Amino acid sequence: ERFAQTKTAEVLSWCPTCQIQFSETVAPSMNDAEEPPFNMTMFAVYLARRLDALRPLLTTPVNKRVALHEYPGAIGVTEAVIDLLSAIPGLEYVDLNMPRIGYQMTSLRAMPEARQDLLANTFKAAEDAKVTTLAGVYHADHRELCAHEDAWPFEIVNFMELIGESMGLHREDLFKRYKLMQDVDAILAASQDMIETNNLDPEDVREV
């Protein structure tokens, strides 16, 4: 209802689950009209539509061979991300030709063996292709993917990091740094300043 009250014609989403819920369930049920009051658009698709405006900002070469860990369920997202990556100077996009199933990693939770096989085969294909970088699309996937970075000869990032790099922007992936530690005490020690700044209970943080 809040989206509809803005009278906007387009609402952006990042998460494919949200995209499916809003565009296929919530928005169509809001009124009796054939058309929902607004269109839901995945952010990558929105950004690719504005590539002509973005391109002049991509000034720093990113000399990397990049493969994409992607899922086809959110229409147009993979194609949009490839277009965006291909616009980055110096970046070489590498197609791993992997099976395309689901809409993100969590959508394969009911098929754990297929999920693990897809992940393992993607990592091996990326290694065989001698990529420098495996880029994911969704943050939910990144939480799983980044934990494997130390086991492979390539970095694991979100595709937006590569766009930011070409724009001269960088922000450390603290989640990945902590995830790779694989040690609760080390994570607590490294994040002590943030725990204190946000008035968190260290034991609550440990449990989470």
Please provide the spans of the model-predicted regions.
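Iron-sulfur cluster-binding electron-transfer modules in prokaryotic oxidoreductases
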Residues: 1-208
